[in-house]
Amino acid sequence: MSNETATLVKLSAAEQAAAIKKGDVTSRELVEAHLKVIEAAEPSIKAFLKVSGDVALEQADAFDAKSAEDKAALPELAGVPIAIKDMIVTKGIETTAASKILEGWVPPYDATVIEKLKAAGMPILGKTNLDEFAQGSSTEHSAYQTTHNPWDTERVPGGSGGGSASAVAAFEAPIALGTDTGGSIRQPGALTGTVGVKPTYGGVSRFGAIAMASSLDQIGPVSRTVLDSALLQEIIGGHDKRDSTSIPEGPRPMVAAAREGAKRDLKGMKVGLIKELGGEGFQPGVEARFGEAVDKLKDMGAEVVEVSCPHIGYSLGAYYIIMPSEVSSNLARYDGMRYGLRVMPPAGVPQTAANMMAYTREAGFGDEVKRRIILGTYALSAGYYDAWYGSAQKVRTLIIEDFKKAFEQVDVLISPTSPSTAFKFGEKMDDPLAMYVNDIATIPANLAGMPAMSIPAGLSDDGLPVGFQFIAPQQRDEVMYKPAAALEAALEDGWNGPIWNDLKTPWLDGLGK
């Protein structure tokens, strides 16, 4: 096997793990290869807020020494490096949530998912960029830098997790972790051509995930293949007593489902096309690729029927009341008193705790975070709570009931992931409502706690990736992995290879041994 950098990094995570098991490559060599790509790509991609190269190499060396004798017994993905969204705490590595208010904060503990990655022998390449506190759909709201889409560096990678998606798409990392509150894994997945998964709410521990909206947040995988996401989800999933919302049962058989799906036999599967998610407001190229992918599902034996979720049209409005309300509550802890940024009042202003908090939050939070705190505080205020927050929760219940009724008819639901392909920087920054609409197809699964996944459906007429979304019943994540893997295989047959064959990667040119 060639050790050339470009050859190594273009392997899937599963292929990299297999190469380690065979003795063709070491974990250190994989880390070194990805660090080379990061060095070459970051000037144009800017996916990482912090590259932890020394830490990754140390972890890789420890893994290589420990696994030298019995490689055959290694768990899947062992030794494969990973990137982490900077919304997940990492012991000894600065964690900022892309906010100035947490600049310089080094956590004294690991999130549960990080503990599991370390136990699996997966070196951490670094922390990836995001919209501040995961609040945004373009990664333009980071306090530090703007991440660029590898398919067109003048366009956004989606958000909030554009850093993890771009890092995986640009071959800076074979796999990554993100968080998904209203589509923050899946929408960037659609815009960058990656596979993005939001597990069932409670299926992956949130302990150590910086809270944005606690009833919606979920950690999940970002990868280039469906199988890689399944492998990673089985590693990070399972019950955690430190998370009160954690589901008692262990991970579902997602890897087996993905491998079964790759056989491309969907006979007996009923697929529901959500009629409310499509048509007006969806880019023609998105609709075209989605329709072609639906035909592929039919060709493999799936029965595709149209289903109605009549209250799904209210999901955007309900979400943008519930989410800011929880943001307002969760972000109240950033007050300059305990950790993070502290800004004292200027001379002439009383040096009180209240003034210190006000000046700290004014300096530490960006415009979008402040906007959502204000919206949430208003929705929770006396006299408005029932009219706004209470009503939104009632709508949420109706959406959950819509999904339950739909799943009485079908096994899995489908829709486009995002109404458009990647848009140019600045195009929607002055219009928050236009930005919020990017998540119209992803938000319903978060409100209902359902597992959902986006996979590449091809390139639109503008040459940019389109996402195809699967939604499965709660605690049945494996149900979406089978058709997703089948569709991935069928589409790649038609493309004569993975979507990555069409991606121009000048940062890989000239990278050798």
UniProtKB/Swiss-Prot annotation:
Protein purpose: Allows the formation of correctly charged Gln-tRNA(Gln) through the transamidation of misacylated Glu-tRNA(Gln) in organisms which lack glutaminyl-tRNA synthetase. The reaction takes place in the presence of glutamine and ATP through an activated gamma-phospho-Glu-tRNA(Gln).
GO molecular function: ATP binding; glutaminyl-tRNA synthase (glutamine-hydrolyzing) activity
Superkingdom in the source lineage: Bacteria
EC number: 6.3.5.7
Family affiliation: Belongs to the amidase family. GatA subfamily.
Keyword Ligase: yes
Signal peptide as annotated in the record: none
Active-site annotation: K85, S160, S184
GO CC term, one of those recorded: glutamyl-tRNA(Gln) amidotransferase complex
HAMAP family: GatA
Protein name: Glutamyl-tRNA(Gln) amidotransferase subunit A
BP term (GO), one: translation
Keywords associated with the record: ATP-binding, Ligase, Nucleotide-binding, Protein biosynthesis
